[in-house]
Swiss-Prot record:
Highest rank taxon of the organism: Bacteria
Lineage of the organism: Bacteria, Bacillati, Bacillota, Bacilli, Lactobacillales
GO molecular function, one term: translation initiation factor activity
Name recorded for this polypeptide: Translation initiation factor IF-3
One GO term of the biological process aspect: ribosome disassembly
Organism: Streptococcus pneumoniae serotype 19F (strain G54)
Compartments reported by the entry: Cytoplasm
Gene: infC
Assembly and binders: Monomer.
Protein's job: IF-3 binds to the 30S ribosomal subunit and shifts the equilibrium between 70S ribosomes and their 50S and 30S subunits in favor of the free subunits, thus enhancing the availability of 30S subunits on which protein synthesis initiation begins.
GO cellular component: cytosol; membrane
């Protein structure tokens, strides 16, 4: 048996429940004209004739309505506009990822500065940053040291970030989440 690695992605563009011209199988429709005006309830043959006279398509846009709603429109143009809108929406979407920076309660100044520099890079790129401190062994009894380190980290990034989630404990780990400041863009 032969299987191909290449799969063709089939996109249904603007054809969710739309029936066009000869695909429409109802007797009468509530007709909407080219400019969006109501033309009333018409037999399908008359609606099709009106669409043919205007050199456009008759498209059934709401088949579940009583009577079904059909619109006289240029389907090719409608499909093009729909694709254009979808493309614009995809461009406007921004994927926000959460990057993690791990610290220890007894972190040294040099290491702290390196982690801080990395977090600043993430924030400048528009990513959120989760700053976590893992307590090992008996360090769990000194949570205030971890809270102090997180407070220093938040203070050092306050010019480009806002605290989205305050420092809190989760098991043997204390964390807070920073988000890029929106007004600084």
């Amino acid at each position: 048996m032969f299987f191909s690695n290449k799969t063709k992605e089939v996109k249904t563009i603007a054809k969710q429940d739309l029936f066009i011209x000869d695909e429409i199988r109802v007797r009468e429709v509530r007709l909407i004209g080219l400019e969006g005006e109501q033309l009333g309830i018409k037999p399908l043959s008359e609606a099709q004739a009106l669409a043919d006279n205007a050199n456009v398509d008759l498209v059934l846009i709401q088949p579940q309505a009583k009577p079904p709603v059909a619109k006289i429109m240029d389907y090719g143009k409608f499909k093009f506009e729909y694709q254009k809108k979808q493309k614009e929406q995809r461009k406007k979407q921004s994927v926000v990822t959460v990057k993690e920076v791990r610290l220890s309660p007894t972190i040294d100044k040099g290491d702290f500065d390196t982690k801080l520099r990395n977090a600043r890079k993430f924030l400048e790129k528009g990513n959120k940053v989760k700053v976590s401190i893992r307590f090992k062994g008996r360090m769990i009894t000194h949570k205030e040291i971890g809270a102090k380190v997180l407070a220093e980290f938040a203070e050092a990034t306050q010019d480009i970030a806002i605290i989205e989630q305050r420092a809190k404990m989760d098991g043997r780990q204390m964390f807070m989440q920073l988000a890029p400041a929106t007004d600084k863009k």
